[in-house]
UniProtKB/Swiss-Prot annotation:
<dbReference type="GO" id="GO:0046872">
    <property type="term" value="F:metal ion binding"/>
</dbReference>
<protein>
    <recommendedName>
        <fullName>Probable ribosomal oxygenase HI_0396</fullName>
        <ecNumber>1.14.11.-</ecNumber>
    </recommendedName>
</protein>
<keyword id="KW-0223">Dioxygenase</keyword>
<dbReference type="Pfam" id="PF08007">
    <property type="entry name" value="JmjC_2"/>
</dbReference>
<feature type="binding site">
    <location>
        <position position="199"/>
    </location>
    <ligand>
        <name>Fe cation</name>
    </ligand>
</feature>
<comment type="similarity">
    <text>Belongs to the ROX family.</text>
</comment>
<feature type="binding site">
    <location>
        <position position="135"/>
    </location>
    <ligand>
        <name>Fe cation</name>
    </ligand>
</feature>
<feature type="domain" description="JmjC">
    <location>
        <begin position="102"/>
        <end position="231"/>
    </location>
</feature>
<dbReference type="Pfam" id="PF20514">
    <property type="entry name" value="ROXA-like_wH"/>
</dbReference>
<comment type="function">
    <text>Oxygenase that catalyzes the hydroxylation of a ribosomal protein.</text>
</comment>
<dbReference type="InterPro" id="IPR039994">
    <property type="entry name" value="NO66-like"/>
</dbReference>
<dbReference type="InterPro" id="IPR003347">
    <property type="entry name" value="JmjC_dom"/>
</dbReference>
<keyword id="KW-0479">Metal-binding</keyword>
<keyword id="KW-0408">Iron</keyword>
<dbReference type="GO" id="GO:0016706">
    <property type="term" value="F:2-oxoglutarate-dependent dioxygenase activity"/>
</dbReference>
<dbReference type="InterPro" id="IPR046799">
    <property type="entry name" value="ROXA-like_wH"/>
</dbReference>
<feature type="binding site">
    <location>
        <position position="137"/>
    </location>
    <ligand>
        <name>Fe cation</name>
    </ligand>
</feature>
Length: 404
């Protein structure tokens, strides 16, 4: 069995995960030279141009006609969109781990950040001079150079008051503030940029930049999850206390008026109730887990069906492992242990299945010896292994697991 601790992270030798999270994460940018050499050669520019034209892909084509004339075109893109291009342009493809499990496995190099914060891997191709302008993002990102070279400038912190160029189809601005980074990234280099920090990348030649994006849920995500929890109540979760009418003091007022003090009183009663309700604590935990394990993009799976005997045969070979498919968002909560995959709570797992998925979500790769040991600890090892192999087939078919 290979555990998470054996994975080599993409940080410099002198920066441990603890140091990075303390001194850099959401505080300041960091250049990591040759931090991810494994990405070099996985894609070439033509691969991305062709992929962007796939009808199932989420892509954007940004054309720069002048400093004040930017146009963006959204998927579906076709070959016609790539004809008569201006000198400066870029094409961006989202959710690239959907199309390359090998690329998706590189998420493990960022395992010092919990996977519930992962968004997706985006790739940007641009010829010399191509860019998407000076901008900032609402999420943290590791920009990895996979092909060619790109010059990156990182400047000021931005917020809701940051002014954008008017009449443009993308959110860009002119004022980068004082530059804190002005570097050319080579293949394999990484640039970490915190959320809301101005940055500007320009292709030095034909280049591919891969963005490993990380983000948090917003309040609307959580409120939506809580609402669904009330609508589809867990039979083990007693939410009847929330069905009781609110008791409000009454003051004289017009017949048709809903007074502000009544609204504020209801708000305070609600907040007090939420703060002292074990049932709501459980519901909120479920809502958070569901929100952060949900994918932004539709999951595409193969039509081919996995065979349990074939899975057994492969896993019995030396060097074969079961691991998480990083195209899936897999996580767990504790007290009690609950497993979530792509926004769903998996509430019908047995003990062995829960243990396997928990370890996969922690970045471990499991071999046949480990899986057999789990089954051998049960009263009926043969039946337990047969059930586990059936489940592994379902996980592979659903895009949750890989057999390597």
């Amino acid at each position: 069995m290979t555990a998470l601790s054996s994975v080599d992270f993409c940080l410099p030798e002198h920066i441990t995960p603890e140091i990075f999270l303390r001194d850099y994460w959401q505080k300041k940018p960091l250049v990591i030279r040759n931090g991810l050499p494994e990405i070099v050669g996985q894609f070439e520019p033509q691969d991305i141009i062709e992929l962007a034209q796939n009808e199932d892909v989420t892509a954007r084509l940004v054309k720069t006609f002048s400093d004040d004339d930017w146009k963006v075109f959204f998927s579906p893109l076709s070959e016609k969109d790539f004809q008569k291009l201006p000198e400066k342009w870029s094409v961006l493809v989202q959710n690239l781990e959907q199309w390359s499990p090998e690329l998706g496995q590189l998420w493990n190099k960022f395992g010092f950040i919990p996977q519930w914060q992962r968004d997706d891997i985006m790739v940007s191709y641009a010829p010399k001079g191509g860019s998407v302008g000076k901008h900032y993002d609402e999420y943290d990102v590791f920009l990895v150079q996979g092909y060619g070279h790109r010059r990156w400038q990182v400047g000021k912190w931005c917020d809701a008051s940051t002014e954008f160029k008017p009449n443009q189809s993308i959110r860009i601005f002119d004022d980068m503030g004082e530059l804190v980074i002005d570097e050319v990234m080579n293949p394999g280099d990484i640039l970490y940029i915190p959320a809301r920090m101005a940055h500007y990348g320009v292709a030095e030649d034909d280049c591919l930049t891969f963005s490993f994006g990380l983000r948090y849920p917003n309040l609307s995500n959580l409120i939506d999850g809580i609402s669904k929890g009330f609508c589809h109540q867990d039979p083990d979760l007693n939410l009847s206390e929330f069905d009781l009418p609110l008791r409000l003091s009454q003051s004289e007022q017009r017949t048709g008026k809903l007074a502000d003090e009544n609204i504020q009183a209801m708000k305070q009663l609600l907040l007090d109730k939420l703060a002292h309700s074990e049932a709501f604590d459980t519901l909120f935990k479920q809502a958070v887990a569901s929100a952060v394990s949900s994918r932004r993009y539709e999951l595409l799976v193969s039509d081919e069906m996995c065979d349990p005997d074939e899975v057994r045969s492969i896993l019995e070979e030396d060097g074969a492992f079961l691991s998480q498919d990083n195209n899936c968002k897999l996580l767990y909560t504790e007290n009690p242990l609950r497993i979530y995959a792509n926004g769903e709570w998996l509430d019908e797992l047995n003990i062995i299945e829960s243990e396997v998925l928990k370890r996969l979500s922690d970045g471990e790769s499991l071999d046949w010896a480990f899986l057999s040991d789990l089954a051998n600890k049960t009263e009926d090892p043969e039946t337990s292994m047969d059930l586990l192999l059936d489940s592994i087939c379902n996980w592979v078919d659903d895009g949750w697991a890989l057999i390597e």
